[in-house]
């Protein structure tokens, strides 16, 4: 074989794949990428609400936390303070919505989404309706008093003058575990 023929054969032979270096980054289709982004966004904000729930537990309150998001920013955060404030309305969602309204300087919270670790009760779901929030994402279902799908569903009642989106089950296990651990510890202390 002459050198010209050898050169042509080598030019058409693929180079061996490199054996070292980082693996190629998978490219997601735009729809999958946006779904992954939406999922990580929701998880991020729910983790912030979980931080509030943990603060509530440390204060001896039922561990429920909430954040209000406007655009991509958390503008309000709160946790249950019923025992601390001796106030039956001091639910995490209620306090966070009040704070958001004060920060925005308006009672209509259009453009806002509430993230809360437990499905809201009737009072808090009613406040979300009155505040005109765009959406509520919650972690654990509340089969005893939930008002966004478990027992009641105020979010889409046709008799009401507003409706909002509900995204349930965000980090549901983590949110449920926070409550389970709190009440287990409370029962244990009561037995001692």
Give residue spans per PLM region:
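Small-residue (primarily alanine) positions within well-ordered alpha-helices
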Residues: 49, 53-56, 66, 76, ...
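Short, basic and Ser/Thr-rich N-terminal targeting/leader segments
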Residues: 60-64, 110
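Short beta-strand scaffold segments in enzyme catalytic cores
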Residues: 64-72
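Immediate flanking context of iron-sulfur cluster ligation sites
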Residues: 106-118
């Amino acid at each position: 074989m002459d050198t010209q023929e050898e050169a042509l054969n080598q030019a058409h032979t693929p180079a061996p794949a490199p054996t070292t270096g980082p693996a190629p980054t998978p490219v997601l289709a735009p729809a999958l990428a946006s779904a992954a982004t939406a999922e990580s966004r929701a998880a991020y904000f729910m983790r912030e609400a979980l931080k509030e729930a943990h603060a509530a537990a440390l204060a001896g309150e039922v561990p429920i936390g909430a954040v209000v998001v406007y655009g991509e920013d958390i503008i309000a955060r709160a946790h249950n303070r019923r025992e601390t404030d001796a106030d039956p309305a001091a639910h995490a969602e209620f306090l966070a919505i009040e704070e958001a309204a004060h920060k925005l300087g308006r009672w209509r919270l259009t453009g806002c989404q509430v993230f809360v670790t437990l499905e809201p009760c009737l009072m808090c779901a009613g406040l979300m309706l009155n505040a005109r929030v765009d959406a509520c994402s919650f972690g654990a279902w509340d089969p005893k008093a939930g008002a966004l799908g478990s027992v009641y569903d105020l979010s889409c009642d046709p008799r009401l003058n507003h409706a909002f989106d509900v995204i349930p089950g965000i980090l549901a296990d983590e949110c449920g575990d926070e409550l389970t651990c709190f009440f287990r510890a409370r029962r244990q202390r009561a037995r001692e």
